[in-house]
Amino acid sequence: MGRAAPGPDEGAEGERPSISATALARMERNRRRALALRQARLAARPYPQAAAGAGPPQGRDTGGGFFLEEEEEEEEQRRAAERIVHPPAPVLQFDYLICGDCGKEFMDSYLMQHFDWATCDNCRDAEDKHKLITRTEAKEEYLLKDCDLDKREPVLRFIVKKNPHNPRWGDMKLYLKLQVIKRALEVWGNEESLQEAKEQRRDSREKMKQKRFDKKVKELRRAVRSSLWKKTASIHEHEYGPEENVDEETYKKTCTVCGHELTYEKM
């Protein structure tokens, strides 16, 4: 007799079909291969992907079947620029200055730079001809006013230096003496008028000085006279001489020191 087919309860309770060892080995190989591929991708790209919009570096199609990277393109441009031959620049004609003393040409100098005075450095005489004077000396010696130095065109140029006598004082303004003399002649017309004005001012100063001196002497004499009078009046005692009979009952005595007369009656 044949064996009867198992019922539903018997099928559920029976054992499930087992996986073969070959299938398990294949699954393990696939898992390891997937891990190896993942690690390879991470090793090739260790940093996170850049933000959107930052694509790979752009290249230039050379038309020869390959792209030229940016660095290679810059190097090629540099080499091309080195191969360019520029024509020589034309020779420039400079506007040379003519020294007013020696007549030679020069490019620049101390007096030209600071005072716009055409004299080269070789001819500069800082101790005599091209001497610098202070603003006070320019006003007193050449009778110039502030407007003559600061407002009259062209305005005189100057340099500023520390006061050598005391650094705490204000800075000095130094002018070129030649330019100050030229400005004084423009103001006064000629040298004779300047000398006359200087003599008049000198005489006026002498008169004012003498007047102040006389006033002080007068005040001193008055003070001395007043002190002597007070001293004499405070300590003088009359020394009368013999009395004289002026009238029947009137007599007088005279001080032998100051001449004071004392008149009195005697009964």
Curated annotation (Swiss-Prot):
One GO BP annotation of this record: nucleotide-excision repair, DNA damage recognition
UniProt KW Zinc-finger keyword: yes
Binding site for Zn(2+): C99, C102, C120, C123
Entry GO CC: nucleoplasm; nucleotide-excision repair factor 1 complex
Zinc finger motifs (unnamed), residue ranges: 99-123
Span(s) of short sequence motif Nuclear localization signal: 25-46
Lineage top rank: taxon: Eukaryota
Xref: Pfam families: XPA_C, XPA_N
InterPro entries: DNA-bd_dom_put_sf, XPA/RAD14, XPA_C, XPA_CS, XPA_sf, Znf_XPA_CS
Family listed: Belongs to the XPA family.
PANTHER family documented for this protein: DNA REPAIR PROTEIN COMPLEMENTING XP-A CELLS
General function of this protein: Involved in DNA excision repair. Initiates repair by binding to damaged sites with various affinities, depending on the photoproduct and the transcriptional state of the region.
Protein name: DNA repair protein complementing XP-A cells homolog
Organism: Gallus gallus (Chicken)
